[in-house]
């Protein structure tokens, strides 16, 4: 089964009109999970990630579902998601990437994954990648007609107003935005043919530390990322994420700019217990070991929590004082007019809940 890179999307600021491109656009919900190209050839099933790495061993229940529900020989494009109550849960999904097969099996039983499909690349001996998306979509729907269970076809609309309503509402079910697809486009692996609209918000956060960049040297230290915090109701400064993606010049400047704030052993830094397992369990601190970090050096340079920055983010993962930024935040500017103590979770926009079953229920 040769590797296939999925077709990608480029970001746009708002939901484009249906006639924005020649041939027209249709819209789909943007699912927040693991992108997957799934191959089936009889009993042989392979699940490949966006970067073509194998995900098969991490989703045994998905392999069984593909054998039961997908055509005998096919290649499909979709998203693997995990449902927790009435919304998607990316944290639970991420836990699947674990070296222990016993742990993967347990998670598959407790939190079974779903496969949401949105494209059909091949069926039997027929390559569909040169056909327009409208035809591929029609073939996908026909191939899964009557299928019920953990494999489904994403819903679609050609109505811009409906897409805008989805964008506003579906975030409450854990979705990520809206994708617009040209009806006449062929399948372009690794090509940014589609358009995506994601939520964009800002927050004022406390900068309480930084990590050095991987190219940093003792003679020329370079900042890699800023460690960001928000105050919980009980007064604890919770680590909510990082801001990165600075130019090399800016990395050097930030080292000098933040030097006066570097904490000393006499300072009572709110994250001084970051290496303590009990402290990690009781509150959100930077540096917790996980399946993603492995043996990576997670140490950081602590800063007195005296400066506030405005950052851009898409959405929060988790509820209340345990929330964190789902992706790396974007540094926008310093907010020296703000007091660090004013940087609380209360400033964040609350997203109204939406019933995920409604999103999954229509193909």
PLM region spans:
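Catalytic cores of nucleic-acid ligases and guanylyltransferases
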Residues: 1-363
């Amino acid at each position: 089964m040769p590797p296939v890179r999925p077709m990608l999307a480029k970001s746009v600021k708002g939901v484009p009109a249906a006639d924005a491109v020649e041939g027209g656009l249709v819209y789909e919900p943007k699912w927040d999970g693991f992108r997957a190209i799934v191959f089936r050839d009889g009993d042989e099933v392979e699940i490949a990630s966006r970067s073509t790495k194998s995900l098969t061993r991490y989703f045994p229940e998905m392999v069984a579902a593909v054998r039961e529900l997908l055509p005998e020989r096919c290649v499909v494009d979709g998203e693997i998601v995990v449902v927790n109550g009435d919304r998607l849960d990316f944290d639970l999904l991420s836990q699947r990437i674990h070296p222990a097969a016993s742990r993967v099996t347990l998670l598959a039983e407790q939190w079974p994954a779903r496969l949401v499909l949105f494209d059909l690349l091949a069926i039997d001996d027929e390559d569909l990648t040169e056909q327009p998306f409208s035809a591929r979509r029609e073939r996908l729907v026909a191939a899964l007609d009557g299928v019920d269970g953990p494999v489904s076809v994403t819903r679609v609309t050609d109505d811009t107003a409906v897409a805008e309503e989805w964008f506003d509402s579906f975030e409450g079910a854990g979705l990520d935005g809206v994708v617009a697809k040209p009806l006449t486009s062929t399948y372009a692996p690794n090509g940014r043919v589609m358009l995506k609209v994601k939520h964009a918000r800002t927050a004022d956060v406390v900068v309480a530390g930084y990590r050095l960049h991987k190219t940093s040297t003792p003679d020329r230290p370079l900042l890699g990322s800023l460690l960001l915090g928000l105050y919980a109701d009980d007064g604890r400064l919770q680590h909510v994420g990082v801001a990165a993606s600075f130019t090399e010049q800016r990395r050097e400047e930030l080292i000098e700019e933040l030097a006066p704030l570097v904490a000393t052993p006499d300072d009572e830094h709110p994250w001084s217990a970051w290496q303590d397992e009990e402290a990690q369990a009781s509150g959100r601190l930077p540096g917790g070991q996980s399946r993603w970090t492995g043996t990576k050096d997670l140490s950081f340079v602590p800063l007195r929590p005296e400066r506030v920055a405005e950052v851009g983010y898409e959405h929060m993962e988790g509820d209340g004082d345990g929330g964190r930024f789902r992706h790396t935040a974007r540094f926008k500017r310093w907010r020296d007019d703000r007091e660090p103590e004013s940087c609380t979770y209360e400033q964040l926009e609350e997203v109204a809940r939406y019933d995920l079953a409604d999103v999954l229920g229509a193909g």
